Amino acid sequence: MNEEVKKNEQFMEVLPAADIIDDEKSAIISLEVPGANAQTVTVEVKDQILSMEARSSLTWHGMQLLYKRSFQLSDAVDVENISARTQDGVLTVTLPKSERAKVHRIQVQ
């Protein structure tokens, strides 16, 4: 796992590596957040910035791990229908694309 680590007073902030899969219908972001679950994860969008924060039950040098990551979203993302879930220490966020972002083929005659 490629991570950037920062210390603050109570938490060890970790920038988790992200896997991004993009297709015609959606983009899917997966982040490794071991020790976190649905109750300790926050996902929000403000001003086209997707922010994710996950508190882990794990500690490092006596400090609780806090995973944080943000992404700039394009106008193609349907913000109202973003979904997120955690399973086996992985946070998966699905970013559906809006209808206007989908490719419409025009038949040439």
Language-model segments: which ranges?
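Alpha-crystallin/small heat shock protein
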Residues: 1-109
